[in-house]
A protein has these predicted regions:
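Catalytic-site signature segments of enzymes, centered on catalytic residues
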Residues: 1-66, 88
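Extended ligand-binding clefts on enzyme/binding-domain cores
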Residues: 20, 120-130
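Stable alpha-helical elements in mature extracytoplasmic
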Residues: 26, 38, 42, 46, ...
Length: 198
């Protein structure tokens, strides 16, 4: 937050769809709203509807912050965060990342079962008017080929804390998982993968 609390507490407002600002608070509010819709811990929902159907391991974890407990239906439930810092977030191995990437590659379908709707997937990978390299949440897009000039415009990636990345290359029917990759190394890695696939 800004040092000036008046600026932080009363930020300038922009009309929806006219501005972009990376901010975990909005993700955490979305997580809390989603928790209120499902009325049960979101890690349970993710496990039942996504992770178990894609055959994920039992080692992944999704934690909330220590101070993110809420009273729901007479029980204390942790509202999980979207980010992997300050003690919260998702912790996932490369194997499970690849499986999630494969689900994304196939537009939410896993072994013939549609786990995420194609309509949702289309929205998630549609560039926003204000930031053409960003879709929903952690769907980063190569629309203008600025981040990955060596890759086609339809390549996208999921980016996690520490530059843990799932690259999805639809034309090649291929997923690449990279762990702790420096940001400036992304294009070089994808370029080498594309060259190796030819």
């Amino acid at each position: 937050p800004a040092q000036d609390s008046k600026t932080w507490l009363n930020p300038e407002r922009a009309a929806p769809g006219t501005a972009y600002e990376y901010n975990d608070s909005r993700v955490n509010v979305l997580a809390l709203a989603t928790l209120n819709i499902w009325r049960r811990p979101l890690p349970q929902v993710l496990k039942e509807y996504i992770m178990d159907p894609i055959g994920a391991s039992n080692t992944w974890r999704w934690f909330g912050y220590d101070n993110s407990w809420v009273l729901m239906d007479g029980q204390m439930v942790q509202s999980v965060s979207g980010g992997g810092h300050w003690g919260g977030g998702m912790f996932i191995n490369a194997y499970d990342m690849a499986r999630f990437g494969y689900l994304s590659l196939h537009k939410g379908k896993w072994k013939g079962q549609q786990l995420l709707s194609e309509e949702w997937f289309k929205m998630a990978t549609t560039p926003t008017p204000v930031k053409t390299d960003y879709g929903f949440m952690n769907y980063f897009l190569n629309t203008d080929q600025k981040a990955l000039p060596s890759a086609p415009a339809n390549v996208f990636w999921h980016l996690g804390n520490g530059n843990n990345i799932i690259f999805v290359l639809p034309d090649q029917d291929f997923v690449v998982v990279a762990r702790w990759l420096k940001g400036d190394g992304m294009d070089g890695l994808v370029k080498r993968v594309l060259e190796a696939k030819q």
